[in-house]
């Protein structure tokens, strides 16, 4: 009587491994990995073959340098894993990225009078990953800075993933005197000196 030995290697399965999402908007540093088990492993250093559908067609259990759609802020990648018997399993995994980090600056309180230092500016931040840090050109470290005089102010924002954005603004001050009226009287005759100009102004503050 002949005998047949049947090896039961277990069900061939592929599960998700570690995921590293993209750190900053439009970077390409995402990572995905899969873990395969069962089936009929290849003999040697590689038990299974892998094929990712990224633009490089990576062929290892971990795909690196992955980009994400800039509109939806996520992208699915498929990995096809094959064992020595030709059995295949496909796993679809998602990589996400934060919205673009952006900052602008608003004047919450303009300088009230020429030569004073009572202006206020506020940095308005969207996107990125909380929390934010603020670095102003005048040494400020919060979203709002005050006691400001005439000049250019620059703020740099950094989020939890060390993504950065900057914004620069010129803070003006009122003029010291506002000209209301200019009176002109022309010289009556050649050689005379009876013409004059009179300027009427108002001190603003």
Give residue spans per PLM region.
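Short, solvent-exposed loop/edge segments of extracellular or virion-exposed proteins
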Residues: 15-26, 104-115, 180-191
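Coil residues (strongly favoring Ser/Thr
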Residues: 3, 32, 70, 84, ...
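A short beta-strand segment in extracellular, disulfide-stabilized domains
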Residues: 28-38, 117-126, 193-201
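Short beta-strand segments within Ig-like beta-sandwich modules, predominantly Fibronectin type-III
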Residues: 53-59, 135-141, 147
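Solvent-exposed loop segments of extracellular immunoglobulin-like
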Residues: 38-51, 127-135, 203-205
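Extracellular interdomain linker/stem segments of modular secreted and single-pass surface proteins
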Residues: 7-14, 22, 96-103, 172-179, ...
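Solvent-exposed segments in extracellular or luminal domains encompassing
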Residues: 61-78, 143-154
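Conserved structural position at the C-terminal beta-strand
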Residues: 81-83, 157-159
